[in-house]
């Protein structure tokens, strides 16, 4: 049997084209689709880990999609799927091609049914005490993996900041408190050292 692809998807930063036609513009709060030249806004309602739980219409009056997840992002219910947007668990794109249902974490793909990445961690030498295929250090309730390379620990007390492991690329073992201001991640005080 042969596999034939009928759609071409091109990504230019946060702009997505399908078959050469503008399809979607991603924003921090959601995304825009178009009816002719008129933009239609869709907004994400996220949980403490950045998972897109509900997609609301531009008026905020109608839920277009509701997502319920298993701990590693597998969908156990996808209700009200009038929206076909694929940015779900940890706000990562769910690639459903060929029925694989893998999340695109930029550096590598994650299989949510296994809770494992399908490729070796590019920073595996820095995390020798854990498997190089684990997602979120095997703790998806208290941690997220923003790019498939490093794990961030979330402070659940009020949801306003995240505790982020030291940047191993520059050999800094400190753990910092980060805040988000005007959409930018700002590094604050050091609260400890990684071991």
Residue spans of the language-model regions?
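Short polybasic amphipathic segments
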Residues: 1, 14-18, 30-33, 151-154, ...
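Surface-exposed charge patches in extracellular/virion surface proteins
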Residues: 2-5, 187
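ABC ATPase nucleotide-binding domain signature region
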Residues: 4-7, 111
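A motif-centric feature for acidic-aromatic and gly/ser/thr-rich catalytic loops and repeats
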Residues: 7-9, 13, 17-23, 28, ...
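Short turn/helix-capping motifs enriched in Asx and small/polar residues
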Residues: 59-74, 98, 106-108, 112-194
